[in-house]
C-alpha cells in the first residue's frame, strides 16, 4: 500500500518591526558608504587646496616718470614655489629691489621666495621703439599702451608637482583714466587672471589706459572691446561692423576663440602695423580692414589670437603664411569677397612674391609671408585630393592647435604626414 506524505511549510511574513529594522540597517550601511566617499572627496579637495598658491601682480602707471612701478607678490602656506627666474633686461627694468633670497646675474633675476611668501619690486620703462624707430609701447600725459608680457617679464618657475596658482592683476593709474585689459576693463582696477594650459599664470596681452574712446559688442558669445586714445583716428564702429560679419567664420574655425577680445590702437606715430597678444591685438588706425590685395590685417592678427599657434626659430613663415592665407579665406567664407576676387588676390600674391623662395627665417614679412600663403593654399588642395575630401588645411590647423606646442619645420611636416600618409609637393621647396 502506497502512502503519500504531504508536508506543508508555512513561511511567516516578516513583521512590521522586522521590516523597519531592515530599512534602518540598509539606511545605516548607505550612510557609512556615503560618509566614506564624502571623506575621500573632502580629503582630495583639501589636498588640492593645499597645492594652490596666490600670485598678485600690481603696477602703477606713472606718466611723470614714464614708468610703471610694479611688484609681484607670492603667498603660500608652504613651500610650493621654490624659485622663479625672470628675464629682465637692464634697459627696461630698473631699481629691482631684491630680497635676501634673490640673485641677479646680468638680465636674469632668480627669485627664491620665502616659505610663506614674498614680494619683488621693480620699475619698468614703458616707452619702447622697434627696429624701425616706431613705438610699440608708449605712455603720455593722457594715455598709456603696452603689453603685459613685457611689464611682467617671462619667467621659468620651479613649483611642486600639481601646484597651481590663483592669480590677480591690479593696475593703478591717474583717477580720470579708464583701463582696458584682456581680463576686463572700465572703471575696474582688479582683474582675475586665468590663462589656459598654464599652471603658473601671469598677466598677458595688451593693456590700454587713459582718456579713451571705447566701443563694446557681443557677437557669437564673444565680448569684443575696441579702445583707443581720444582723437587717435581709430574708426571703432567700422571695426565692430567688420567683425559682425566675419566673427562667425572665425569662431567656426576656432571654437576656442577667447571669450573676451580686446582690440587697441594708439597715436599716429606708433608702429604702423598689427601685433597680436593673448586675447588681444594692436592695430594702427591707418591700417585698412581690407587692404589693396584684399587680405585683411585685422583678420591676420585675429588668426594669431584665436589659434594660439607659435613657432620656434626658422618656422615663422609657417605661422605667418597660415595667418595670411586665412585672412583671405575667412573673408571668402563670410561672403566678404567673391570667389573670383579671392582667386585674383592669390594671383597678385604670386606675382608679387615670384622671386622669393620659401626660406627658414626668424621673422617672416612681406613677400615671404605672401609666399607662405600661396604654399598653404597649394597644401590645402593637396590634402583634399590625397584624402578624398575628408581632410583639409582646417584639419591640419586643428591638429596643430590641439598639440599646443611651438611649431618647427619638422613638426609641421610630421603633422601633414599624419593626415595624408605621404609627403606633399607643396612643401618640396620648403625648409
Where are these regions (language model features)?
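Acidic/His/Gly-enriched intrinsically disordered linker/tail segments
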Residues: 292, 312-387, 398-404
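Beta/coil-rich, acidic/histidine-enriched accessory regions frequently appended to metallopeptidases
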Residues: 44-75, 403-431
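Juxtacatalytic substrate-recognition/specificity segment
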Residues: 213-315
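Bacterial N-terminal signal peptides
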Residues: 26-36
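Extended, low-hydrophobicity, Ser/Thr/Pro/Gly-biased non-transmembrane segments
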Residues: 51, 58, 63-65, 71-77, ...
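Boundary at the C-terminal end of the N-terminal hydrophobic targeting segment
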Residues: 38-43
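Solvent-exposed beta-hairpin/edge-strand motifs
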Residues: 78-106, 170-182
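N-terminal secretory signal peptides that target proteins for export/translocation
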Residues: 1-20
